[in-house]
Amino acid sequence: HVVCRRQRQMCIRDRDVVYANGAGPRLHHVAYHTPEIANVVHGADVMSSLGLAETMDRAPGRHGIGNAFFIYYRDPDGHRVETFTSHYNVIDIDHEPTRWDLSDLRRSQLWGFPAPRKWFNEATCFEDIPVHPPMLDAPPVTLEDFLEGWS
């Protein structure tokens, strides 16, 4: 990250590497930033017009951590790809940080349906690298769990 300070604000630029609980090491997804929500939606429209709507893996939603609007797809090789809007570009350093708890569903998604189970369990393995079990026992609430509660 490149962090710069200006007028009591902090901005973070460049790339993010996010570590999440789960079996690993594995690659969960790569992400592409778009400047506006309309760009993310336009991408979904283009995918649909090309007959690729079924590649949508999770969507649409807004992450609690970062407040980014997102859609996830699968590329032709099965890797998960996210398109998302800006997130935490400007942070007021006087603002009290939010402490997110693993049991708080809003950290992953502020609104919309939870992700399907496969979203949490499927990821790309690295060649010749053994996969280890998760370090924390924090089972997610999945779409399947959510829908089971309705029946």
Locate the predicted segments by residue:
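Vicinal oxygen chelate
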Residues: 32-151
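Single conserved hydrophobic/aromatic residue that forms the stacking wall/gate
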Residues: 1-12
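Aromatic/pi-system hotspot detector in well-structured domains
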Residues: 5, 15, 82
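Long C-terminal interaction/binding lobes of large macromolecular proteins
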Residues: 24
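Intrinsic, low-complexity N-terminal interaction/targeting segments
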Residues: 13-19
